């Protein structure tokens, strides 16, 4: 790469320290020009920085990383200056005056990828680590950055290479001493690989949920207490609460953390038949969000004296809560028994005003989240991109297994399966895909 890039690696604004990174062939010249000399590699050295006109910029810590032993694999440096915006601005202006270019988002990590310092799956781990908000996200991102998916992919790729060698030998050298039972010898290997890849693809949904959030829907009739419960769980007034049925017209998503995992809790419009066009759209959205949720909490108004109308959508994995048990009217206990009898799942009586009830509910929800996201080993695949490529690879392997009598077709299917796996780590990938992935990074990374 012929040009040299720079960018602030810390967030803009007033702070104790700001870091500006530089990478590329002219890094050494830039450091000498601003700092007066080249510090000892990989040691923080105090230097006074001056621009090209001799004006002092700041007293800074300067770190020099000669390539290829740097993050990007090329000559790189960091300037740690005082965090005032004027100081950072003066340093950025000085670097631009030396002919260096402001980096695009993710360009430092892209250079690391293109110089073989990490593969594409590991680069995605860097992005996930920067974006992590919970312990679950942080741990998963570290696994990705550490090469968990890359190592699994490499093992699969090696096995495919051996199988492909058998098929290609049978095709290219039909008259030589090549085993006649090539397909029979390759079948167990391909079946094992297909099963492992399919399992990883299925488990990728768990990794996606860790990244994006476990989705919990609060569902029920109007005035069942959904908004009140959401506010109690969130610890703030996230939704409007009134005595008027149908107040909630749209899905209100509130992020929170349970057991170290990100959770998206959604208050939804009350489910009922209505002639109101706006409310009807809210009901449609409520049903759609609930259908895609990982867990549904069905709320039944315990203060009502009428037998609850239980929706047919209530399923075995759902939870049912009989709300407003603190009110003197109603039949909360009777409705709990009725729910258990009619739909076969236990129903708990709760009140959003009871600290003990809310503590119990949070603990119960945390257990469900951990059961869904935290069981066993962490998922190798964590993104939709991974899942789609794994599905493509397994499909090709299943085709290859079915081509017992057509070695040429089997070889091509194995080759395409290997190609799909290679795209996970970026060994081959269209430029547009790489650009889209690295564009999600922050500037300076």
UniProtKB/Swiss-Prot annotation:
Amino acids binding GTP: 223-228, 242-248, 267-270
Pfam families attached to this UniProt entry: MMR_HSR1 (PF01926), MnmE_helical (PF12631), TrmE_N (PF10396)
Any one GO cellular component localisation term in the record: cytoplasm
InterPro entries: G_TrmE (IPR031168), GTP-bd (IPR006073), GTP-bd_TrmE_N (IPR018948), GTPase_MnmE (IPR004520), MnmE_dom2 (IPR027368), MnmE_helical (IPR025867), P-loop_NTPase (IPR027417), Small_GTP-bd (IPR005225)
EC number: 3.6.-.-
Keywords linked to the UniProt accession: Cytoplasm, GTP-binding, Hydrolase, Magnesium, Metal-binding, Nucleotide-binding, Potassium, tRNA processing
Superkingdom, taxonomy of origin: Bacteria
Binding site for Mg(2+): 227, 248
Domain TrmE-type G: 213-370
Cofactor dependency: K(+)
Major localization class: cytoplasm
Compartments reported by the entry: Cytoplasm
Self-association and partners: Homodimer. Heterotetramer of two MnmE and two MnmG subunits.
Cross-referenced NCBIfam families: mnmE_trmE_thdF, PRK05291.1-3, small_GTP
Job description of the protein: Exhibits a very high intrinsic GTPase hydrolysis rate. Involved in the addition of a carboxymethylaminomethyl (cmnm) group at the wobble position (U34) of certain tRNAs, forming tRNA-cmnm(5)s(2)U34.
Family the entry assigns: Belongs to the TRAFAC class TrmE-Era-EngA-EngB-Septin-like GTPase superfamily. TrmE GTPase family.
HAMAP family xrefs: GTPase_MnmE (MF_00379)
Name of the protein in its database record: tRNA modification GTPase MnmE
């Amino acid at each position: 790469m012929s040009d040299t890039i720079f960018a602030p690696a810390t967030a803009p604004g007033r702070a104790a320290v700001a870091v500006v990174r530089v990478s590329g062939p002219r890094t050494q010249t830039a450091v000498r020009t601003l700092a007066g000399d080249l510090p000892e590699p990989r040691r923080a050295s105090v230097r006074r920085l001056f621009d090209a006109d001799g004006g002092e910029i700041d007293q800074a810590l300067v770190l020099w990383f000669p390539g290829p032993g740097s993050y990007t694999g090329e000559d790189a440096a960091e300037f740690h200056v005082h965090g005032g915006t004027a100081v950072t601005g003066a340093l950025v202006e000085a670097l631009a005056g030396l002919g260096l270019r402001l980096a695009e988002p993710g360009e430092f990590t892209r250079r690391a990828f293109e110089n073989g310092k990490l593969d594409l799956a590991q680069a995605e781990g860097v992005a996930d680590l920067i974006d992590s908000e919970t312990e679950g996200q942080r741990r998963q991102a570290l696994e990705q950055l550490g090469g968990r998916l890359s190592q699994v992919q490499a093992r699969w790729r090696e096995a495919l290479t051996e199988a492909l060698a058998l098929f290609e030998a049978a095709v290219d050298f039909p008259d030589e001493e090549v085993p006649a039972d090539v397909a029979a010898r390759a079948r167990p290997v391909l079946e094992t690989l297909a099963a492992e890849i399919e399992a990883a693809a299925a488990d990728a949904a768990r990794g996606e949920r860790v990244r994006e959030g476990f989705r919990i829907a609060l569902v029920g009739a109007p005035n069942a207490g959904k908004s009140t419960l959401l506010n109690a769980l969130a610890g703030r007034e996230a939704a409007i609460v009134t005595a008027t049925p149908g107040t909630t017209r749209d899905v209100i998503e509130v992020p929170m953390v349970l057991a170290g995992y990100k959770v998206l809790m959604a208050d939804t419009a009350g489910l009922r038949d209505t002639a109101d066009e706006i409310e009807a759209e809210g009901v449609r959205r409520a049903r759609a969000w609930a259908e895609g949720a990982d867990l549904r909490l069905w709320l039944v108004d315990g203060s009502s004296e009428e037998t609850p109308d239980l929706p047919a959508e209530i399923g075995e994995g759902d939870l049912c809560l009989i709300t407003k048990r603190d009110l003197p009217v109603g039949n909360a206990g009777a409705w709990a028994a009725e729910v258990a009898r009619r739909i076969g799942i236990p129903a708990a009586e709760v009140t959003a005003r009871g600290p003990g009830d809310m503590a119990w509910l949070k603990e119960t929800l945390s257990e469900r989240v951990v059961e869904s996201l935290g069981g066993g080993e962490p998922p190798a695949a964590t993104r939709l991109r991974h899942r789609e490529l794994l599905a493509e690879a397994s499909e090709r392997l299943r085709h290859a297994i079915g081509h017992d009598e057509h070695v040429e077709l089997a070889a091509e299917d194995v080759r395409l399966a290997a190609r799909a796996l290679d795209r996970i780590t970026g060994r081959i990938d269209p430029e547009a895909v790489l650009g889209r992935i690295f564009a999600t990074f922050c500037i300076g990374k």
